[in-house]
UniProtKB/Swiss-Prot annotation:
Residues 1-33, 82-123 are annotated as: Disordered. InterPro entries: C11orf98 (IPR037691). This is Uncharacterized protein C11orf98 homolog. Residues 18-33 have a biased composition (Basic residues).
C-alpha cells in the first residue's frame, strides 16, 4: 500500500507543477485584493483588527472602546470648528475685494527738451 502523498522518490508531473503554481498565483491575487489600501490616519484609533474587519466587509460597523470613541469625536469636533472658522474668513475677504477700488496712477512727466549750453564758449 502506497503512502497517502504518493510514491516517495517519484518527481512531480508537469500537470501537478502547473496546479501548484496556479494555486500559488491565485492565493497571491486573493491576498492582494483583500488587502486594505490606504494610510492609517491615527494609529491610536485604528487597530489591526479594524483593518482586518475592513478587508472582510467594508460596510461593517467597527466597535470602539470609550477612549477611542472620545478621541474620534474630539477630532470630528475640531475639524468642524476649523471648517467653520475657514468659512467665516473666506466671505470677509470676498466682501472687501468685491468693491471696485480707484487705481492710483503715477503721473509721468513728458521729457522736455533742454538745450545744453556750452560753458566753455562763454568764458
Amino acid at each position: 500500500m502506497a503512502p497517502p502523498g504518493g510514491k516517495i522518490n517519484r518527481p512531480r508531473t508537469e500537470l501537478k507543477k502547473k496546479l501548484f503554481k496556479r494555486r500559488r498565483v491565485l492565493s497571491r491575487d486573493r491576498r492582494r485584493k483583500r488587502q486594505v489600501v490606504g494610510a492609517v490616519i491615527d494609529e491610536g484609533l485604528t487597530t489591526k483588527h479594524h483593518l482586518k474587519k475592513r478587508a472582510s466587509s467594508a460596510r461593517a460597523n467597527i466597535t470602539l472602546s470609550g477612549k477611542k470613541r472620545r478621541k474620534l469625536l474630539q477630532q470630528i469636533r475640531l475639524a468642524q470648528k476649523e471648517k467653520a472658522a475657514m468659512e467665516v474668513e473666506a466671505p470677509s475677504k470676498s466682501t472687501r475685494t468685491s468693491q471696485p477700488q480707484p487705481k492710483q496712477q503715477k503721473k509721468i512727466k513728458a521729457p522736455q527738451d533742454v538745450a545744453m549750453e556750452d560753458l566753455e564758449d562763454k568764458s
